[in-house]
Amino acid sequence: MQFRLVASAMNVRAEAMEPPVPQQAPAETCMTAQTRLSRWGRGLARGALIATALAACSPKAATTETTEDAVLDATNDVEVGVDAPADATAADVFDVSGVHPRLMFTKEHKAIIVARQNKPPFDAMWQRLRDQAAATPVAPTPGTWDSGLWSQYAFAAQANAILAWALDDAAAGAKAKQLLLALQDNLEDNDDLDLDIHIPGVLLPYANAWDLLQATPWITADEAKQAQKQLASVTRKFVAKNLDDSFMRMVSFIFTQNNHPLRAASSIGYIALAFPDDPDATRWLDWATDQMDYLLGPKGHYVQSDGGVVEGPFYFSFGFGAVVPFLLALDRNSPADAVHHHTCITRNDVDPWDDNGCVEGEAFTLKNPLRDPTFLSTLDWSIALRRPSGVRAVLNDTHVAVTNGAALLTSLGGANYLLWDWATNAVLPYDTQKFQDLTAWYLGLVADVTPAPPPWRNRFFPAAGHATFRSGWGTDDLWLMLVADHGPARKSLHNHADGASFALSAYGEDLLIDTGYYKPDSMQNPLTTDSPSHNVILVDGVGAPKRGLLNTWGDTDAFLENTHDGEMVAWAEGRIAYEKAEIRRGIAFARKRYFVVADRIQSEVATPRTFQWRAHLWAGFDVGGTYTLAGNRLTIDRQHGGLLIAATTTAGDPTFVEPPFKPLKPPHVHDTDGSGNHAVADATISAVAPGFLVVLAPFKEGATEDDGPLTVTAVTAGAASGAWTIDGATAGTKWRDVAWLRDANAGSTLTLADGHTLETDAAFVLVAESGAYALIAGGTHLTLDGKSLIANNAAPVAVFGP
């Protein structure tokens, strides 16, 4: 069965070829429920209206029969995948040898795990494991099935099973068995609309406990079969409720195409690997491997060709925590040439997924993504988005994020910088619990390799629309990220209208921010979704079109173009058009010391309008630090580092002003690690098409010379142009650079106060007064004091020097 989804701003409907929306509920009720579900993200809609609508639209979701036979009947109501060939057995798909353990660990891991009991950082993980094993979860409340509570049971069972297996601990074995057999399968009593993303915390550790205990003398074959029956029953009921039910399938998996199906598929696929003799194992594994093949492959548009992930680092990492355990278990339990079958019922047929080409039941072999270069490039992307503190960039719907589980891939030969990234995070060092508790996995699956930072600094991801600049990999280094996403890369439920926005950190401080994920109403988009909540240019107070609900994308495309990576200067452009203006935002990173933002604007409107160069400051109100506005300059001071912003335009100097403030309302509200208010300032000017030339000069508080404040001085540039000189020092050697932005009708010569002369036809110039390096954009040549630095250039950007 396939759904054609038609979404509009306030009216979302799903047209099913079969079955139609049940007649028990008026169509309006179902549409209201679907609309109110909003963009499926943090804090799903849970009100009485939703519960009522769900019950009306989906009788199965409201009343589920509780017998095993009834669950099997319900499961068979909807065909998922295809029946296995008559002569097929589970052994044709994966290992059914009965060897234990084989999911999280194999017998070869035992010596490694035991040897790490007193070895940092694993000693702390061992202690965490013992603490989990000592926990005694409360008894479940009759008539409920709480995934959070059963997750506590599952992790306690897993921890005790590891102690029993690794240390021959009989008491731990007895407790693990008790917790394993305690699992109840009354999933029909669960009313959590987020169960699809919470279920990994139950199924994975419980399956590991079952697997490990069977490598000990402390569980009998009959007890293992009883535990398997309960765990398989929970899985079967979960599949019936979330995958087979047409309404829940739509809102959980079809609309989303993101971490929701990835986490759910990883969970039921893991159970299929654990119980290959289960009658539904092949069916479960077909859907699980189909989702890995589709969403993590080229057709699903979730992972872009350069490794960028459409929903950003937060939800990518959230999904990753469940995906990696499944793929690791699949790698050791399924042969590379195993045949699976595509399952199309969770495909979405609207843009950008209307090219999915899914054929129900089509046979395929899965190249495990853990061995696929494109999927592995997501980890380079994630590390490129690493801020100096170690946590990931605030991008799209994001709070504090790290990619927990990436270091495990060193066991498969993954790069040593995956281990470095895990070990050197200043906020969450050696984290094993963010999004999914993988503590036990780290004990056996982190390779003994020497950690080292990546061999690269700046990275550009044009398909994803992300550019990152950094001076190095230390906590005091400079970092900036530019966003310019288009097409499938911006068409995801967690995306924001943030084309051509950027964020900046330096000297141990965040200075210019993305406002994050403030969502006080779970039935609506976050208040921080749209353009005014980002560092963009507003035209008469308006930015890119607002985001829509669900699969009504809104927003507009932006394009990352004309990138250059160099030792002295790096460059990237983000191009976007809205409000009858095309904005080409270029960002130069010079000397690993400062940034220049050069915004070239073309307007279809011949009369002046108000242009606002917006900056979200990590200062003021609830976030500490101070800021000062002084005409066309702005200074931020925080404990360790600060930032000078100096702005001019090709139409004269703008003035920094603050927009009206309303607590916890855009543009001042943020939620990056807790909600609050921050300062916002707009460099404002009225003109037809004022090109902005803005110097971003970070400094270390209290420092002089290299890391102290740079001297940024205005240059008289003539009509239709603006210019700055920037003075600083590197290793005690002083230098001066010139930044110059020109409209097409500007003069071609710039004479500096000290007598140096530049001549160009370029729209933007950044050049060392010494002639050590130069960059031009939108031009053919540049001379300095009559000496040609760049000539006969036909490319959008050209660089002289390293």
What is the meaning of each model-derived region?
Residues A14-C30, L54-V93:
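Ser/Thr-rich, Pro/Gly/Ala-heavy low-complexity intrinsically disordered linkers and tails
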Residues F318-L511, H564, I685-A689, V712-T716, ...:
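Carbohydrate-active enzyme catalytic cores, enriched for enzymes
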Residues Y518, S522-G801:
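CBM-like, beta-strand-rich accessory domains located in the C-terminal region of large
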Residues Q2, Q23-Q24, Q34:
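Low-complexity, intrinsically disordered or signal/transmembrane-proximal segments
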